Structure formats: structure tokens, C-alpha cells
Regions:
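Intrinsically disordered, low-complexity repeat tracts enriched in Gly/Pro/Ser/Thr and acidic residues
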Residues: 1-332
Length: 332
């Protein structure tokens, strides 16, 4: 079943992709004053003038057309991912909309800006210097805020809550052509309650996660209708569970490390059933096997064969004996 999120570079500290590294490329005269001809909103002339001076000294301001062309050519999937309007913050005092600004690192930012401390604050879009990743969302003092969309050029994305630049809280993660997960995250990984559609292995899972793996209780259903409901540990069936196979067979009991192991009950689609000990998906130990209600074997098993002491019950008769690999070698 595998770790749903280990196969993509999307899992990383998002803030490392979008950190302002200091000096920016100097703009040519006139660009800044043309784009900022009047102070927007309620910011004071003094604050605004200071911002213009810094931008003119340190920033390269690119045109809106160039910015949109980069997005349309490098991130064509951006518009297919709905961004919730409730997470677009309303500008407050000293926060205003800045045009596309290119840092010396090559990173590009367009969005809300704090004119007091000259840092990204509010809602904005940032494109990494190599144009491989884009962040659209909330900013706080030049760092990724509490909510946003982290999108890779190949279409992989995370949309949801962040904490200190990491995926944390509720979110949605899609690895194109491989899987889509919706649920809770912690430290960049699924952790808590969550649902995953695995397109590669053709299954859906709903349940508990820990550190990117299925841990706790859950329901796993494959496209062929094989279905498991029960306990998981490290992505494997482990504990008490029920598995229903596509042909109608059913097992209910204990699992260890992904295998049927321990006490359990198996019912075949033709009515036969077994109740007893299992080891590695095979009858091993003590158990009862019913051919029907009138005939059953009670005794010892080895690798799916009657082996050791046992009794065959047929109607009201009993036959005690010693068995060896499914055949009686001594009995009455």
C-alpha cells in the first residue's frame, strides 16, 4: 500500500522556496513612480514615499502582462484548483497591493505588501526563481502564513493550512496520476483523519494516519471490491479486522504485519468455514473446519492440512485419529 506522500518533491518546508534573500535588482528610472503614481488605500504619504524609494533602489518591477504570461505558461493548472474566498484577507492599514516585483534571487512576487516594514503581508502570489513552484496564499512578515496553495510546475499541489511553512492542519494534497489525499496534516505529512484515492494502486482509504502512514482504524477498498475494515499499523493490516474478497470469501480476526495471523474465522463463498488459529494466511495450530453443518473437523493443523490429533464429526458420529498432512494415519 505504501506511504502516500513519499514519492513527490512537494513534501518539503515550503518557506525554503520563498525566502527573500536581501538585495533586489535595481529598476530603471520611472518604473516605480509610474506604477505607484498615487498612494493606494489609507497609507500615509511618508510611508508610501519611503516604500517607493526602496523599491526604486532595490527592485525590478515587471509588467502585469509578463507576470500573467509566466503563470499561464509555467502553471497552467493554477486555474483548475479553486481557492476558497474566505482565505483572501481584507487589506488593513498600511497594507496595499504591489505590482509584480522580481527579487535578485529571481523570485517574483505580486500581492499585498506592508508599507511600514517593506515585507510581504496579506494575500499574494510568489513564483520561485526556477519557475518550478508557486505559492498563492497568506503571507506574514515575508513568510508563508496560515493558509495557501503550494503548486508545482508538474501539477502536484497542496491546498490547505500551514504552520511555520509546513503543511499542518486541514488540507488537500494531489500527486498527479498517483494519489489525492484530503484530511489532516502534521509536519508535511498526513496525520490524523484523512481520505486517500490511490490511482496507481486503485484503492480508496478512509481512516487514521500517523506520520504519513495508515495507523489506527480505517476502511480500505480496492477497485475490484476487495474491502478491509479494521486496524492498521505502519501502512499494514495489524490488529483486529475484517476482509471481504472479490469472490465473496470473508475473513474476520487477527492480523500481524499485513498477514492473517492469530485467531480468526474464515467463511468461503460456498458455505465452508474455519474457526481457529492462523499463521501467514494458513491454518496453523488448533481449529475447526466445517464442510457443512453436519460435518466438521476439530483438531490440529499445519500449513492448511490436518496434522496431529483431531476428530471428524459427521452427523452424530465421531472419528478420533492422528493426521499427517491431511490424511488420517491412525484412528478408530
Amino acid at each position: 500500500m505504501g506511504n502516500c506522500c513519499a514519492r513527490s518533491s512537494l513534501i518539503q518546508d515550503a518557506n525554503t522556496q520563498f525566502v527573500f534573500q536581501g538585495n533586489m535588482t535595481e529598476t530603471s528610472d520611472g518604473k516605480g513612480s509610474k506604477l505607484y503614481s498615487t498612494p493606494p488605500g489609507k497609507i500615509s504619504n511618508t510611508i508610501y514615499t519611503n516604500f517607493i524609494r526602496i523599491i526604486k533602489e532595490q527592485a525590478e518591477i515587471i509588467s502585469e502582462t509578463d507576470f500573467l504570461n509566466i503563470i499561464s505558461s509555467e502553471f497552467p493548472n493554477l486555474n483548475r484548483i479553486p481557492y476558497p474566498e474566505q482565505h483572501i484577507p481584507t487589506p488593513i492599514k498600511n497594507i496595499f497591493e504591489a505590482p509584480p516585483i522580481k527579487f535578485s534571487s529571481g523570485e517574483i512576487y505580486k500581492g499585498q505588501w506592508n508599507a511600514t516594514n517593506n515585507k510581504r503581508n496579506g494575500f499574494g502570489i510568489s513564483i520561485s526563481a526556477d519557475h518550478n513552484t508557486l505559492f498563492k496564499g497568506e503571507w506574514n512578515s515575508d513568510k508563508i502564513g496560515d493558509f495557501g496553495l503550494f503548486l508545482e510546475k508538474n501539477g502536484n499541489y497542496y491546498l490547505g493550512e500551514f504552520k511555520e511553512g509546513k503543511f499542518e492542519g486541514k488540507g488537500e494534497l494531489e500527486i498527479v496520476g498517483i494519489s489525492r489525499y484530503k484530511g489532516e496534516f502534521k509536519n508535511d505529512l498526513p496525520d490524523g483523519k484523512g481520505n486517500i484515492e490511490d490511482f496507481e494502486n486503485e484503492y480508496e482509504f478512509k481512516g487514521d494516519w500517523e506520520a504519513g502512514k495508515k495507523n489506527g482504524r480505517g476502511i480500505l477498498e480496492f477497485s475490484d471490491k476487495t474491502r478491509y475494515e479494521g486496524e492498521f499499523k505502519n501502512d499494514l493490516y495489524d490488529g483486529i479486522g475484517i476482509i471481504k474478497f472479490k469472490n465473496g470469501d470473508k475473513y474476520e480476526g487477527e492480523f500481524v504485519g499485513g498477514n492473517i495471523k492469530g485467531k480468526g474465522k474464515f467463511i468461503w463463498n460456498d458455505g465452508k468455514r474455519y474457526d481457529g488459529d492462523y499463521e501467514d494466511f494458513m491454518k496453523n495450530g488448533f481449529g475447526k473446519f466445517y464442510w457443512n453443518d453436519n460435518k466438521y473437523y476439530e483438531g490440529q493443523w499445519l500449513n492448511n492440512k490436518q496434522h496431529g490429533k483431531g476428530i471428524i464429526h459427521y452427523n452424530e458420529e465421531e472419528k478420533n485419529g492422528t493426521f499427517r498432512f491431511g490424511k488420517i494415519i491412525k484412528g478408530n
